Every structure is written in structure tokens, then in C-alpha cells.
């Protein structure tokens, strides 16, 4: 007797099949069916060296060996009744059965559930859990829901909630109106924001722009100062000193002004024909910067700067000063000729 036949005989029950008049067809038995009735053998396909010690068949752990599963019989598949038995006290089982199988058992159970629900509802109402909650929000706070023009939120609301929202909206409007009335409205400043939404401090930005503009002007002045020579700086300082002295001078200066006469006599002109008749040296042989000057002849320049005492007399310039004087003299000569031709005509 096989294991499946033993289990079917002692532990499985099945209802007898109803008698039918149709003759049953005989199925041909195959070798595969015989193997299925005998059972299936489940074994690992892994090589022996990869198997764990728990899967190896030995005397200590025979339970991990190949498992033989019995095939399900036809009687077990046809059964409609559960053979499980409930183990427990007979008193509780009998009471529960009597309660559940009474004629009004369903109605009593529904009434009990409704009574419990009503009791819980009364308890919540007594505790005030479902009362309308009125929350005082700030002017800047908003719940994000849709609101009507009156201030009430869209959707189903209780009368208390609607009244509270309308009152809050009116309070907010009054506060905004009071803010823009009187001096407060004139004292408000425009708030500027950048692309990310951060507030821009306009006063700080303006101060920064002014500082950058001042630095730019200072750099331009320093660049111009670097292009100037020592003589030009000295002349600028002398003009500044003259302007300071002019503040206390009289408005009219006559030919008898000694200071003006001395200043004009001290000037050196390269084309002065009467300079050779002077018996007193006015230049002193030194420049305005205090350095000694060259005493020989030199090519004139447009700034009137004399060469230093160490000059060897060789003109190493690119000839611009000579061409500048030649162009200027040519222009003056042409103007004089045009005037003479006009007078002759």
C-alpha cells in the first residue's frame, strides 16, 4: 500500500459521486501517470561541492534529504466538507452558537452597533470636538483655499464658520484701509525684489553705486596725473596759489602794480629780442622743480620746457615738435597771405 492510498483511506473523506446513466470512458494509463501516482522527487541540481552541509544526506540530518510528495487523489479533490475540528471549551461554544443562531440575532447585533455609535457621537458632542473652530489668522496668513468676495471659503460651511470668515475679511480690509490713510500711506516705501524674490535694499544699492562712481572718477584723475610731468604739476600749483591770492586782491590792476610787473619780467621768452640787453639774470639757471638747466641753444617745444644741464645737444625725438611748429607757422603765414590778397583786390 502506497502513502497516498494510506492517507486517502484513514484521513480523507469524499461524498459519493451521483450515479449517472452515461457509461464512463476508460482512460489509458501511461507511464507518466504511473510516475505521478507514485510521487515526485525534488532534488538540487547544484553540484556536490556547492551544496551546503544542511542539504547533504547523512545520519545526523536525514530530514534534509530528498522529499517525496504524494499525489493528490481524486477523492480529496472532490470533497466539499472541511475535516478540521475546533478544540475549545464546550460551554463557550454552546453559548456563542445559541447567540448566533437565534431568530433575532442579526437584529440585536445591529441595534447594539447603532447604540454604540450613538453613544460615541454624544460623547464627542459633549466634549466639544465637532464645534466650529474659529481661528484668528494674521493679515498675511491664508489657508490657500478658494474664497468668495465676502471672505467666506467656497464649499459647504456651517453658519458659525461663514460668519467668522466674513468678520475676519472685514477686519483685514479695515486694517488695510487704515494703513493707507493719513501719514502712514505717504511714509511707505516701494519694495523692490530680484528674480528670486528677495527684497532689494534700494538705499544700500544707491550708496554702492555712488561709491563705485567716486572710485571711477578717482582712478581717472590718477591716470591723468600720471601723464603729467613735474613742470606741469608745478604750474598747476602756481595757478592754484594765484587763485587763492586773487581772493584778497583788488578788482582792478593797473600798470603801476609792482607784483604784476615783477612776475612779467621773470618770464623767459625764447624769441625775446631784448633779453640780451638784460644785465641781471632772472632764470637763475634752475627749473621750477629746482634742478639745473641747459644753458645752450635747444629746439623749442610747445610746453616751453628747457632740457636739463646733462643734455648733450643731440635731438633724439621723433620730430613731432618740429613738425608741429612748422604746421603752425604755415597756417599763420597762409592766413596772412589770404588777408593781403583780399586787401589787394
Swiss-Prot record:
Residues 1-106, 120-148, 265-314 are annotated as: Disordered. Residues 129-143 have a biased composition (Acidic residues). The keyword Kinase does not apply. It is found in: Cytoplasm; Nucleus. Keywords: Coiled coil, Cytoplasm, mRNA processing, mRNA splicing, Nucleus, Spliceosome. Residues 91-105 have a biased composition (Low complexity). This is Pre-mRNA-splicing factor cwc26. It comes from Emericella nidulans (strain FGSC A4 / ATCC 38163 / CBS 112.46 / NRRL 194 / M139).
Amino acid at each position: 500500500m502506497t502513502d497516498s492510498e494510506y492517507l486517502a483511506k484513514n484521513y480523507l473523506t469524499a461524498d459519493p459521486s451521483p450515479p449517472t446513466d452515461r457509461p464512463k470512458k476508460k482512460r489509458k494509463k501511461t507511464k507518466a501517470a504511473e510516475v505521478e501516482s507514485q510521487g515526485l522527487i525534488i532534488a538540487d541540481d547544484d553540484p556536490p561541492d556547492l551544496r551546503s552541509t544542511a542539504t547533504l544526506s547523512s545520519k545526523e540530518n536525514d530530514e534534509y534529504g530528498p522529499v517525496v510528495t504524494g499525489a493528490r487523489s481524486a477523492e480529496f479533490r472532490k470533497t466539499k466538507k472541511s475535516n478540521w475540528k475546533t478544540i475549545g471549551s464546550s460551554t463557550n461554544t454552546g453559548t456563542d452558537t445559541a447567540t448566533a443562531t437565534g431568530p433575532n440575532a442579526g437584529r440585536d447585533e445591529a441595534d447594539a452597533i447603532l447604540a454604540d455609535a450613538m453613544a460615541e457621537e454624544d460623547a464627542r458632542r459633549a466634549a466639544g470636538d465637532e464645534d466650529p473652530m474659529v481661528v484668528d489668522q494674521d493679515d498675511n496668513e491664508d489657508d490657500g483655499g478658494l474664497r468668495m468676495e465676502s471672505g467666506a471659503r467656497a464649499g459647504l460651511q456651517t453658519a458659525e464658520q461663514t460668519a467668522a470668515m466674513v468678520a475676519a475679511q472685514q477686519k483685514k480690509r479695515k486694517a488695510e484701509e487704515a494703513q493707507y490713510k493719513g501719514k502712514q500711506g505717504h511714509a511707505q516705501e516701494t519694495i523692490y525684489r530680484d528674480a528670486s524674490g528677495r527684497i532689494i535694499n534700494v538705499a544700500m544699492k544707491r550708496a554702492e553705486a555712488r561709491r563705485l562712481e567716486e572710485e571711477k572718477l578717482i582712478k581717472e584723475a590718477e591716470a591723468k596725473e600720471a601723464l603729467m610731468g613735474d613742470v606741469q604739476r608745478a604750474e598747476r600749483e602756481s595757478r592754484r596759489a594765484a587763485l587763492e591770492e586773487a581772493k584778497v586782491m583788488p578788482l582792478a590792476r593797473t600798470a603801476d602794480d609792482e607784483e604784476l610787473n615783477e612776475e612779467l619780467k621773470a618770464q623767459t621768452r625764447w624769441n625775446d629780442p631784448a633779453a640780451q640787453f638784460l644785465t641781471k639774470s632772472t632764470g637763475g639757471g634752475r627749473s621750477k622743480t629746482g634742478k639745473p638747466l641747459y644753458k645752450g641753444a635747444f629746439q623749442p617745444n610747445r610746453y616751453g620746457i628747457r632740457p636739463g644741464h646733462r643734455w648733450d645737444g643731440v635731438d633724439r625725438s621723433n620730430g613731432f615738435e618740429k613738425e608741429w611748429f612748422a604746421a603752425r607757422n604755415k597756417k599763420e603765414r597762409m592766413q596772412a597771405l589770404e588777408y593781403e590778397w583780399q586787401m589787394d583786390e
